[in-house]
UniProtKB/Swiss-Prot annotation:
Originating species: Bos taurus (Bovine)
Glycosylation sites per record: N29, N34
Disulfide links within the chain: C117-C197
Extracellular side: 1-45, 104-127, 189-213, 280-293
Segments traversing the membrane: 46-68, 81-103, 128-146, 166-188, 214-236, 257-279, 294-316
A GO MF term: neuropeptide receptor activity
Membrane-topology descriptor: Multi-pass membrane protein
Biased composition, class Low complexity, residue ranges: 12-25
SUPFAM superfamilies noted in UniProt: Family A G protein-coupled receptor-like (SSF81321)
Name of protein: Neuropeptides B/W receptor type 2
Function: Interacts specifically with a number of opioid ligands. Receptor for neuropeptides B and W, which may be involved in neuroendocrine system regulation, food intake and the organization of other signals.
């Protein structure tokens, strides 16, 4: 299961590491709720289920609304909305399995069996990769649109069908990226004989565990973020050149085409996921003791990454006029 970010160091142990989406990969001898964290923070036992429940409820309702509106409204059949739809599906799937995290936390054991353990861990890890890669797809699409507009060119190849194909490729890539975690996922008994859902690596466990962190960090953050940084740096350079050589008309038109919605979704995604991956770097490079402060920071970072799954619908409602209009129409139809 996804747990605290694991800011604590990696200790040598023969037990499987707790399951996680990559945030809570602390190297210890149990889950986050029994052996991982001692009892000096009993407030977490009450607070975490409340936070997770709010995220789950808001995320399920919000993403379900996004999916229904985009599928039913003719005006929402655009390239950008294809990517938004897939991002909502990914976030919705994650919030759908979040109750298992809540149940595990309250029961302090895994009660759901091997099959559901593998499924939940797979969806957990899918959320890491799918979120960032659909954000990247939206940003790359916006980059190409701005460049084409600035050059007064059309984009006949930019179609909804191609966006669907690109989305399918993202899902296939994410599935391949998650397969290694699915292979090692399973139910085990920790040293306290408590049933847990986690990742069971072969020996040497420490090396495998470190490799899993690096794998998630590189594929789930470094590669897509470096790509986006290069693209946006190139975009700024080109727009600056247009201002110098082509006059303000093309530049103004290009600026108008920059989608505030895409930039806002990207910014929120980075805000929610950057601390998550920075925590992985800290865990790989330092050996922090399991102090109350480290435990609290770990859970805060984990909860922040969870929050990304429920914030996007609010951005669409505030920044996307067509989405607001279609949502109001759908609500009126339901009321009638």
């Amino acid at each position: 299961m996804m747990e605290a970010t694991g800011l604590e160091g990696l200790e040598s142990t023969s037990s499987p590491c707790p399951g996680s989406t990559g945030t809570g990969l602390s190297w210890d001898n149990g889950t986050r709720h029994n052996a991982t964290f001692p009892e000096p923070l009993p407030a977490l036992y009450v607070l975490l289920p409340v936070v997770y429940s709010v995220i789950c409820a808001v995320g399920l309702v919000g993403n379900a609304a996004v999916i229904c509106v985009i599928l039913r409204a003719p005006k929402m059949k655009t390239v950008t909305h294809v990517f938004i739809l897939n991002l909502a599906i990914a976030d919705g799937l994650f919030t759908l399995v979040l109750p298992t995290n809540i149940a595990e936390h309250l029961l302090q054991r895994w009660p759901f069996g091997e099959v559901l353990c593998k499924l939940v861990l797979a969806i957990d890890h899918c959320n890491i990769f799918s979120s960032v890669y659909f954000l990247a797809a939206m940003s790359i699409d916006r980059y190409l649109v701005v460049l084409a507009t600035a050059r007064s060119r059309r984009m006949p190849r930019r179609t909804v069908h191609r966006a669907k194909v690109a989305s399918l490729c993202v899902w296939l890539g994410v599935t391949v990226a998650v397969l290694p975690f699915l292979t090692f996922a399973g139910v085990y008994n920790n040293e306290l004989q408590v049933t847990s859902c986690g990742l069971s690596f072969p020996r040497p466990e420490r090396a495998w565990f470190q490799a899993s962190r690096i794998y998630t960090l590189v594929l789930g953050f470094v590669v897509p973020m470096c790509t986006l940084c290069v693209l946006y740096a190139d975009l700024l350079r080109r727009l600056r050149a247009l201002r110098l050589h082509s006059g303000a008309k093309a530049l103004g038109k290009a600026k108008r085409k920059v989608s505030l919605l895409v930039l806002a979704v990207l910014a929120v995604g980075l805000l929610c996921w950057t601390p998550f991956h920075l925590a992985s770097i800290v865990a790989l490079t330092t050996d922090l003791p399991q102090t109350p402060l480290v435990i609290i920071v770990s859970y805060v970072v984990t909860s922040l990454s969870y929050t990304s799954s429920c914030l996007n619908p609010f951005l669409y409602a505030f920044l996307d006029h067509s989405f607001r209009k279609s949502l109001r129409t759908a609500c009126r139809c339901q009321g009638a």
